Amino acid sequence: MATPRPGAPGALRTAVLGGTGWLGRHVCELAARRGHHVLAVARRPRPHVAPHQFAELDLARASPESIGRLLREHRVDVVVNATDAANATDGWARTDEDLADLNLGLVRRLLAALGTVEKRVRLVHIGTMHEYGEVPAGTVMDEALHPRPVTPYTRSKLAGSQAVLAATRTGAADGLVLRVANVSGPHPSPESFPGKLVALLREAVATGDRMPVTLGDARRDFVDVRDVAEAVLKAVESTATGQAVNIGSGTAVDMPTLVRLFVTAAGYPAEILDERAQEVRSLGGAWTRADIQRAAHLLGWRPRTTLAESLRDMWWTDRAEHRPVVGR
């Protein structure tokens, strides 16, 4: 296992790019609880990042000079790049150029910015298990697997991760790439599959109708967003560098099982579902199951939240936020 950074877990000045997003907000919250100084960076502020220092920056267009200036002004020790072109605001309606601009272009500009900062700033870059591309069903996907992504999204994510790894291996940067499986848990991005499930069940509960859901035959690895945030913080506080690390549950679940588990974990009978089977558009491969041994050995990380707990908390967090106001 890699040793912690000198003084860790002391107070590190941690900038979270994409700090208002699904994963970013959980990283900000956990980093603050750990005693780190958090700087959330995003295009616009959101209420849930109010407890943290915030810097407004359009990362899709920010120059290396503006990023470097931000890092110097706030004396940042660690940058977490939690941005993703398939984000909560814009969804998946992106051109290939848009995907490349953020998933790769931002990484290149960020690496250039790190080179202008006098002190060594650590980088934890959030990639995706879908960078590996299509693999045969049953494959346990470890980091030795040669990536072969086929979609514009996954190719752009891989290119960003490879840029970070190349910089760390040449000594131009210090840090890790975390390749994260599909995510579940509280505050999902509206355009994500879990986010759409929450919206569909919310509508069904409000109207008394059945919950229509279109399902493909994919089997995916789902990991709770809070467990991912824990992995990110372990990477922040580690000295390990120059490696990709898979972050997942280590289990593949088929989509019908996932949906039924979500509904029953929320407290409703599976009969509420109106399931429709057909091919579903996806950003990644039809099978993912992460080998997470490197995360255990290098970072001392393992997932702690069951899928049922993750889906239950995802639903009840949403219910608390959308509870009708009595008397109005």
Please describe what each predicted stretch is:
Residues 89-97, 134-138, 189:
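Conserved catalytic-core motifs of eukaryotic protein kinase domains, centered on the activation segment
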Residues 137, 165-220, 225, 261-262:
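NAD(P)-dependent short-chain dehydrogenase/reductase
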Residues 41-45:
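N-terminal Rossmann-fold cofactor-binding loop
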Residues 81, 108-150:
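Conserved Rossmann-fold NAD(P)-dependent oxidoreductase catalytic core, especially the SDR/UDP-sugar
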Residues 59-102:
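NAD(P)H-binding glycine-rich loop region in Rossmannoid oxidoreductase-like domains
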Residues 156:
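Active-site helix of classical SDR
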Residues 204-328:
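C-terminal substrate-binding subdomain of Rossmann-fold SDR/epimerase-dehydratase oxidoreductases
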Residues 14-34:
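N-terminal Rossmann NAD(P)H-binding glycine-rich loop of SDR-like oxidoreductase domains
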